Amino acid sequence: MENRWQVMIVWQVDRMKIRTWNSLVKHHMYISKRAAGWFYRHHYESRHPRVSSEVHIPLEEDSKLVIITYWGLHTGERDWHLGQGVSIEWRQKRYRTQVDPGLADQLIHLHYFDCFSDSAIRKAILGQRVSPRCNYQAGHNKVGSLQYLALTALITPKKIKPPLPSVRKLVEDRWNNPQKTRGHRGSHTMNGH
């Protein structure tokens, strides 16, 4: 019998970002309790040798978001692609599909964090409690409504420290956009080129 390959999207990530992500998840699971219901699986609890951690985020009664971090992958064409990666899956019973980081953040925002949204005016008219600020800015992928922009101009959003874990921040690629850093003038190694 021949080998059958299964292809999946794995975002190449710096290992320090993975450590930061895991620390933020654990902090908000155990200390701040903002990520109540999330489940963290260590590398020694997985049967797959390349899995370094898994974070299971329940969404509805039988669906969840699973963020899996890998180590020991083949390195990429650049020096900093050191064999670390992240995959993001949406699972419901036996069905699995991969999602992009923006959609993952939106799903987390939708199920876990209250926000002033388009329906806030209707809620206020009905006498329901309306939150004047958003606790999870990473869940927004576009400019908010005029009402939201007016409210944010009136009430400054409160910064949460440490920040809530964002999947988009975890997989963002800052390496391919050269950033100028302070250093000697004309130094090609310091200015990102």
From Swiss-Prot:
The modification Phosphoserine is found at residues 145, 166. Processed in virion by the viral protease. Highly phosphorylated on serine and threonine residues. Residues 14-17, 75-80 are annotated as: Interaction with host APOBEC3F. Its main location: host cell. The modification Phosphothreonine is found at residues 97, 156, 189. Residues 54-73 are annotated as: Interaction with host APOBEC3F and APOBEC3G. It comes from the Viruses. Residues 152-181 are annotated as: SOCS box-like. Zn(2+) binds at residues 109, 115, 134, 140. Residues 76-115 are annotated as: RNA-binding. One of its GO terms (cellular component) is virion component. It is found in: Host cytoplasm; Host cell membrane; Virion. GO terms for biological process: viral life cycle. The record marks 151-152 as: Cleavage in virion (by viral protease). Residues 152-165 are annotated as: Multimerization. A motif (BC-box-like motif) lies at residues 145-154. A motif (HCCH motif) lies at residues 109-140. Induction: Expressed late during infection in a Rev-dependent manner. Residues 172-173 are annotated as: Membrane association. It holds the Pfam family Vif. Belongs to the primate lentivirus group Vif protein family. Vif-defective viruses show catastrophic failure in reverse transcription due to APOBEC-induced mutations that initiate a DNA base repair pathway and compromise the structural integrity of the ssDNA. In the absence of Vif, the virion is morphologically abnormal. HIV-1 lineages are divided in three main groups, M (for Major), O (for Outlier), and N (for New, or Non-M, Non-O). The vast majority of strains found worldwide belong to the group M. Group O seems to be endemic to and largely confined to Cameroon and neighboring countries in West Central Africa, where these viruses represent a small minority of HIV-1 strains. The group N is represented by a limited number of isolates from Cameroonian persons. The group M is further subdivided in 9 clades or subtypes (A to D, F to H, J and K). This is Virion infectivity factor. It comes from Human immunodeficiency virus type 1 group M subtype F2 (isolate MP257) (HIV-1).
